[in-house]
């Protein structure tokens, strides 16, 4: 097993629109070893989110397209994986904590169900087992009265608690 967990090489991403082509990411390269933390910082609109979404295979196509580069995770080129293999990888081996949880959480679904869903999909847990696990995860991220909060909706939580729900997921 390689020491390099994630390697991005010369990644370029563009969005083709009727008004022209917008180059969101231009030849970005970086690597991340196991146990390391990488902070991606920059001005608004510089490509941080597009880079992260590219790693997860979540660039909307069209209009977005990865024009060139390589994204390797544990020695697998993610750009060569079929959609099902990439879906299995997402949420189990690699994930993203979105910056604004209110736009990522579904406002009409209780948070317990939202935390439980990836557990059912990626670990094959039953609904009841996944909800029990969701309560444990909410407790681990220090949501007060975590098991009672399983039935709460995103708008009933503070911004910080919503962010912790995303971390639990």
Regions found by a protein language model. Give the residues of each.
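ABC transporter nucleotide-binding domains
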Residues: 1-169
